[in-house]
Structures are given as structure tokens and as C-alpha cells.
């Protein structure tokens, strides 16, 4: 198991909060404050991010490996079941958790990213152009060039770009973050036959924000076909990082679904 930095606050039923790229657990600070009065909030820095280990092997960043990390955290804390809330790559991990360890899941909340079985249409492929760029070993050099000018433009809707860049400037951090794309979004996976997924049986809330520059609404709404108990909320006036753009609204949506 990798060494992970984990923030734990509050008492009550356990809730895992899972961030994505290029963030760390403090992305959830507003939601932690809103939930800790009624829940034990567990917010890890996923492997490669924040203060957690940054393994060298690309395959170490497969989402299934992070599911294993989460199960180990719950086992260490003596938690049988938890609610799981994920955003961006954290949402991909949350879906994988629901599919591979349904007996450990109470309720699921996914922000921005829909079920992996939803077909990828042309609009989504256009928005996902950067995933191909990140496969190349020169990507790190391009992103760092001219005081991170390319990255600053790419994360232009992030409310905290300087914090993100400070994180990625640490030794090995940028490569670790890009390895999530190299491990899980490699173009060769387009040639794999369609996967059969078990039904998601946990009550699931999907939230998509109208200002998301990276994910389409159809990717989220299409998740309904794979979930037994599905609820969808469309959040107006927020970008991809809705936890920071609309913290009170996001916290209220999560709390309403979990309570």
C-alpha cells in the first residue's frame, strides 16, 4: 500500500471525499466544514497528489489501485460501509468503488464525471483533447514552459491556479498527475471491446455544472441507464471546480443526498 495523507474530521457515518487532477484534498475544505457536524469526513490526497506518495510506475495510477487504497483506509479505521463522493478523477475512482466493492458503499455522489459505460460522443472527444497530449513524454516540458503559460490557460476556470501550480512544481508531482491519464486514458484503450458493467445499486446523485469546459452533460445524464436509483442535478453558474465556485450549493446537494 502507498503512504497516503488523509484528513479526517467530525463524527458520524463515514464519507469519503475524492478529488481529481490537479488538486488535493483541500479542494473539499468547504464541504468538510459543512459535513463534519454529522459525518466522519475522510478526505485523502489520492496517490500522486498532495502529500501522498508519488510512485514511479505508471500502472500504479490505475483507478483500481486507488480503490484498494480507499478500502485499506476504511479497514484501518474499522469502517464497514461509507458514503463516497468524487469529482473529476475522484469521480472515476468513486464509480470504480461502486462497481468493485458495492458491499462497502452506502450512497454515491459523482461530480462532473459520468458512468464509464456511457458512450463517448464527438463533443466529448473534442473536449478531451488534452488527454491525448498528456500521453507524450514532452507534455511536462510544454506545461512548465514560460512560467506554466499553457497550464494556466488550460485550467483557466480554476479559482486557485497559483495554488495548483505551486503543487505541481514539487519534485515528481507533475509527472505523477499526468500518469493518471497515461494509466487510465491511453488511446489504445479505444480498441478494447465494450465492457459489461454490473448495475450500480447504491442510491446515486450525479451533478454537472453548466460552465464545465471538460465534460459534457450527456456523459452525466447517460449514467441513468447504469444505476438503479439515480438522481441528477444541473448546477448553473459554476465551472468544473464547482466545490469552489458554488460551495454552499454543492455542500447542500451532498448533504441532502446523504441524509
Q: Which residues are covered by each model-predicted region?
A:
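Flexible "cap/lid" subdomain of the alpha/beta-hydrolase fold that forms the substrate-access gate
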Residues: 4, 14, 49-85, 89-234, ...
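A short, glycine- and basic residue-enriched loop/turn
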Residues: 24-25, 92, 238-239
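Two-component system phosphotransfer/interaction surface
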Residues: 251-255, 259
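Conserved HGGG/HGGXW glycine-rich cap/lid loop of the alpha/beta-hydrolase fold
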Residues: 7-56
Amino acid at each position: 500500500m502507498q503512504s497516503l495523507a488523509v484528513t479526517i474530521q467530525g463524527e458520524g457515518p463515514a464519507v469519503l471525499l475524492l478529488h481529481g487532477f490537479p488538486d488535493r484534498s483541500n479542494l473539499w475544505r468547504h464541504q468538510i466544514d459543512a459535513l463534519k457536524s454529522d459525518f466522519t469526513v475522510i478526505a485523502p490526497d489520492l496517490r500522486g497528489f498532495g502529500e501522498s506518495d508519488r510512485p514511479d510506475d505508471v500502472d500504479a495510477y490505475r483507478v483500481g489501485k486507488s480503490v484498494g487504497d480507499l478500502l485499506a483506509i476504511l479497514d484501518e479505521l474499522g469502517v464497514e460501509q461509507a458514503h463516497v463522493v468524487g469529482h473529476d478523477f475522484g469521480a472515476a475512482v468513486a464509480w470504480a468503488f461502486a462497481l468493485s466493492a458495492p458491499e462497502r458503499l452506502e450512497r454515491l455522489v459523482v461530480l462532473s464525471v459520468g458512468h464509464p459505460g456511457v458512450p463517448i460522443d464527438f463533443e466529448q472527444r473534442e473536449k478531451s483533447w488534452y488527454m491525448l497530449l498528456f500521453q507524450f513524454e514532452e507534455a511536462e516540458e510544454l506545461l512548465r514552459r514560460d512560467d506554466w503559460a499553457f497550464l494556466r490557460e488550460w485550467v483557466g476556470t480554476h479559482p486557485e491556479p497559483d495554488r495548483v501550480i505551486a503543487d505541481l512544481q514539487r519534485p515528481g508531482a507533475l509527472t505523477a498527475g499526468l500518469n493518471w491519464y497515461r494509466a487510465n486514458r491511453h488511446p489504445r484503450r479505444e480498441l478494447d471491446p465494450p465492457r459489461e458493467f454490473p448495475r450500480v445499486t447504491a442510491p446515486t446523485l450525479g451533478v454537472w455544472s453548466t460552465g464545465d469546459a471538460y465534460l459534457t452533460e450527456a456523459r452525466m445524464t447517460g449514467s441513468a441507464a447504469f444505476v438503479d436509483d439515480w438522481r441528477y442535478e444541473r448546477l448553473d453558474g459554476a465551472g468544473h471546480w464547482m466545490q469552489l465556485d458554488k460551495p454552499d450549493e454543492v455542500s447542500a446537494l451532498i448533504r441532502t443526498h446523504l441524509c
